[in-house]
């Protein structure tokens, strides 16, 4: 359930983080960055400054501020895409376009997983 959500803009979409995931992600990023490196501190500052706690109303809805919609180029219809433990909110016209063409996708999969021996545990199916 989405008790509190923290949206940030990332790659032309809004990403909603459940509060517990947000704090874990923020901590993970903080641990990877050098606080004495000005550029890395600016990255962290930008990441956390875009977040805002949003609590659903009695019907489970959240109202996204206009500035978030404008930042993501959302004018009317949206598409929700569940990615791991976050929810991405895209302008429908952007999300209806392929994120990668089939050749790029195939090449990326081969690059990432081509040397892996991926199999599944039949007992878990």
What are these regions (language model features)?
Residues 2-6:
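Short, small-residue-biased leader/transition segments that mark boundaries at the very start
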Residues 7-53, 58, 67-125:
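Flexible "stalk/tail and boundary" regions
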């Amino acid at each position: 359930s989405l008790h509190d959500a923290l949206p940030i803009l990332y790659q032309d979409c809004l990403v909603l983080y459940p509060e517990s995931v947000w704090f874990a992600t923020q901590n993970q990023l903080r641990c990877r960055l050098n606080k004495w490196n000005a550029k890395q501190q600016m990255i962290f500052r930008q990441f956390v400054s875009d977040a805002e706690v949003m609590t659903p109303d009695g019907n489970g809805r959240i109202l996204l501020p206009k500035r978030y919609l404008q930042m993501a180029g959302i004018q009317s219809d949206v598409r929700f895409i569940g990615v791991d433990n976050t929810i991405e909110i895209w302008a429908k016209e952007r999300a209806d376009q392929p994120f990668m063409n089939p050749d790029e996708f195939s090449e990326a999969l081969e690059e990432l997983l081509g040397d892996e021996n991926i199999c599944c545990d039949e007992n878990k199916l």
